[in-house]
Amino acid sequence: MAKKVVAVIKLALDAGKANPAPPVGPALGQHGVNIMMFCKEYNARTQDKAGYVIPVEISVFEDRSFTFITKTPPASVLITKAAKIQKGSGESAKGSVGSISRAQLEEIAKTKLPDLNCTSIESAMRIIEGTARNMGVSISD
């Protein structure tokens, strides 16, 4: 018989840098999860993605055991790295803060495809292009 899931916790953590300090400690501690075990497993699984923020979905079971799934980095993080900017524009309608090429857009779409609600690269590219436009990043051909 399958274990009963008590809670699902969603966090966005720096790859390879999870530690028991907030936000990890309080989020897991209230469900009785072994925080250090989670930190070690998460850091081991994400050490090759250093520099990115990796979302994680932790399922906590009634016997206090857990499993977790790592997702792909947020599109906004991938776009800022590709455009070599610190952050998106606060007023995207007024002007562009950077630009990315179609090839970079396609690469980001391929990376994000497993987490997006679509099946083709073209539709994934349109989703990422919309995110870039809202950040004030233009797409150059």
Swiss-Prot record:
Key words, A-Z: Methylation, Ribonucleoprotein, Ribosomal protein, RNA-binding, rRNA-binding
Residues forming coiled coils: none
Protein name per its UniProtKB record: Large ribosomal subunit protein uL11
Post-translational modification: One or more lysine residues are methylated.
UniProt xrefs under Gene3D superfamilies: Ribosomal protein L11, C-terminal domain, Ribosomal protein L11/L12, N-terminal domain
Superkingdom, natural source: Bacteria
SMART domains: RL11
Quaternary structure and partners: Part of the ribosomal stalk of the 50S ribosomal subunit. Interacts with L10 and the large rRNA to form the base of the stalk. L10 forms an elongated spine to which L12 dimers bind in a sequential fashion forming a multimeric L10(L12)X complex.
Task performed by this protein: Forms part of the ribosomal stalk which helps the ribosome interact with GTP-bound translation factors.
GO cellular component: cytosolic large ribosomal subunit
InterPro entries associated with the record: Ribosomal_uL11 (IPR000911), Ribosomal_uL11_bac-typ (IPR006519), Ribosomal_uL11_C (IPR020783), Ribosomal_uL11_C_sf (IPR036769), Ribosomal_uL11_CS (IPR020785), Ribosomal_uL11_N (IPR020784), Ribosomal_uL11_N_sf (IPR036796)
A GO term, aspect molecular function: large ribosomal subunit rRNA binding
Cited PROSITE patterns: RIBOSOMAL_L11
Family of this protein: Belongs to the universal ribosomal protein uL11 family.
One GO biological process term: translation
PANTHER family attached to this UniProt entry: 60S RIBOSOMAL PROTEIN L12 (PTHR11661), LARGE RIBOSOMAL SUBUNIT PROTEIN UL11M (PTHR11661:SF1)
